[in-house]
Amino acid sequence: MPALGKIFVTGTTGNQGGAALRNLLKQGFHVKALVRNPAVARLDHQENLEVIKGDLNEPASYKQHLHECDGVFCNLTYIHGIDKEIRQGFELVNVSRENNVKYFVYSSVIGSDLNTGIPHWESKNKIENHIRSSGMDHTILRPSSLYENLLIPQVKSRILKGKLVLPTKKNTVQQFISSEDIGKITTTIFLNPEKYRGKTMNLASEQMDGEQLAATFSKAMGKKIKFQQLPTFITRLVMGKDLAKMFRWVNNNDACFVKDMQALKNEFPGMIGFEEWIRVHFN
């Protein structure tokens, strides 16, 4: 078992938490997976996997399980409210510190520190700052857009019918990464805590505009996929004010924060390319 042997993981039924869980187990870590409903989570029985029933809204439901943990991987969602996300993050940091957790890895979002006015970016910056002030050894990850966002049923169904419909303009350049790579990077950090202590890392493995995304889909799927921009008023109506504000910002600003992507790929070899990812999930 690695030196930081026991890792507490949140969001294990989601993309990032699930990827962290899988990759940590592959490398011999003991994982404590926090879930609200183990029966619904349906996590396979695996050696070194301990499923913990608890709720991030109720620290008393999970704090005793942090006592023997060496590390925490934290990924939170804002979908139940920004204030709730911030409170969950602060409380998990506080309880981790009280239980002498040695290392805290937080998956935030790229651009969280830029005063964009995007609520679910700025909430994560508050959690980042609370982690820094906690005194715990830590690494903060700032992933770019996830490939997995393209698996949202409404998006995927349109792609399968020949249209990539997104709120971004056709020439808006974005950076992307897979959740699986975030899980691999998280595992590398826990294997090498001295190397990554105190670092804040922007993460991306691909950079494309809307038309390039559609062209890559066309190549990987062997059929024509056309890009189409979702009108702003529909974005706001369907996705809400927060995401509409985010896409408006992305459409009007430089959202490419990883300036040396090759250096990142050299640091973390084997990152998944977009075409490779499409072939796995759309064929």
Segments predicted by a language model, with ranges:
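N-terminal Rossmann-like NAD(P) cofactor-binding module of classical short-chain dehydrogenase/reductase
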Residues: 66, 70-73, 105
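Electropositive phosphate-/nucleotide-binding environments in soluble metabolic enzymes
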Residues: 18, 86, 121, 180, ...
